[in-house]
Amino acid sequence: MSPDPIPYDAPVVERGFGFFETLLLVGRRAVLWDAHLRRLLATLEALELPAPSGEAVESASRAALAGIADDDAERSLRLSWIAIGHDVEQPASWRLDASVRAIPPNTLERREGSRAMTAPDRFRRDSSGFKSTSYFGAVAALRHARKAGCHEALFRDGDAYVEGSSTALVAWNGGRLAGLGPGGLPSVTAEAFLEGAGERRGVGRGELLAGSFLLGSLTTAAPVLSLDGEECARPPAMLRAIEAFRERLRSDAALQKTL
């Protein structure tokens, strides 16, 4: 991570203008590296903003991992592309940061199963199609959930549930998967799980109660245990699929990049 301070009036500070990716590290192996890098660069291209090169992102990541052994320990790798200058059309106004962090305790606990609640309507994710640092709605919703004794808050679009505050949401539907509907962040981890299968739509409350799970780079995959205090079913086939996917993330070299 750059040791240089960020100006107090930088766009990323005053207006949350920046972008980031969070990756699971297993030792020095970055899980779903290619897909995360692709999403970051595609976002910047779609918004016609300056972008770092893939080589620069990889170099910064390697530097951040200095001294870390290639063992089975799990950590978080955060990649940030943030606006520190006022003229955001100029490459010089942007800064690339890469940092290694511990996985948050709430995330580790959520892996064992998540108690979820419906996010209050007053909390809405800003520009949900982009992984931006403008994250107030998600942070506020997750804080609200934690105060209620839950691990995750779920956003709705009308009557359909779309995503969690920090995770993607998929309904099992007896193996006919559904999730990643309009209005949610395109999830790298959920796409890796689905591998092109499933219906791309919001899901109903009844579908979630019948069996559903959360997906995220650090959460990996976790069943939803309850929704607003109502118990959710956990079909054995769904639990087996979750565990198989988690093991793939940890051990499949095709899904990893050694830094």
Q: Positions of the model-derived regions?
A:
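Helix-start/capping segments and mature chain N-termini
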Residues: 1-63, 84-259
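Ordered, amphipathic secondary-structure segments that act as subunit-interaction surfaces
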Residues: 70-81
